[in-house]
């Protein structure tokens, strides 16, 4: 779950601006990346 923290900084989810996108993944503008090891 370590990679999850990196994704938050990406502006995908975890940010107040992407409150809705955090669930639908639309706030990213692209398919939300999966927390894969070595992905950071």
From Swiss-Prot:
It comes from Pseudechis australis (Mulga snake). It is found in: Secreted. Belongs to the natriuretic peptide family. Disulfide bonds join 12-28. Exhibits hypotensive and vasodepressor activities. Recombinant PaNP-c inhibits the angiotensin converting enzyme (ACE). Residues 1-8 form a propeptide. Residues 1-40 are annotated as: Disordered. One of its GO terms (molecular function) is peptidase inhibitor activity. The keyword Disulfide bond applies. It holds the Pfam family ANP. Negative results: recombinant PaNP-c does not demonstrate any stimulation of cGMP production via the natriuretic peptide receptor-A (NPR1) and does not inhibit platelet aggregation. GO terms for biological process: regulation of blood pressure; vasodilation. One of its GO terms (cellular component) is extracellular region. This is Natriuretic peptide PaNP-c. InterPro entries: Natr_peptide, Natr_peptide_CS. Keywords: Disulfide bond, Hypotensive agent, Metalloenzyme inhibitor, Metalloprotease inhibitor, Protease inhibitor, Secreted, Toxin, Vasoactive, Vasodilator. Expressed by the venom gland. The keyword Transmembrane helix does not apply.
């Amino acid at each position: 779950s370590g990679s999850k923290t990196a994704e938050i900084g990406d502006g995908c989810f975890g940010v107040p601006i992407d409150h809705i996108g955090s669930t639908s993944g639309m706030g990213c503008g692209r398919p939300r990346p999966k927390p894969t090891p070595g992905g950071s």
